[in-house]
Amino acid sequence: MSQAAVVYWSGTGHTEAMAQAIAAAQADLFTAAEFDADKAAHYAAIAFGCPSMGAEQLEESEFEPMFEAVKPALAGKKIALFGSYGWGGGEWMRIWEDDCAAAGLTLCAESVICQDEPDDAALAACAALGEALK
């Protein structure tokens, strides 16, 4: 098991492609349904990825409940956020970053967002995010 994990939810495959680019830096890859607080305890660094859904929010049936459940186990860990969106300007990510700050979590790198399918620049930013988890 590596010291870093990448946990994501993807509806279209865009956020999954971002997760794979981040995990290429020797991180274990999990879907939101596969991850819980017990698994979080085994990692020093975790990147969480979720696309913007509905009215600029996290996916509500799988990802958000998982994230809320693991949040207490994230204190003192390197945390990073990423995701894709179809429209809007990325407000869901700013809300998510604020939620992490309110919970006392510190992000180890600037969050990575991209509109629709990640292009080469977004994939390069994801690779850099993966390196920041080391």
Predicted region positions:
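FMN-binding flavodoxin-like domain, especially the glycine-rich phosphate-binding loop
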Residues: 2-4, 10-32, 37-134
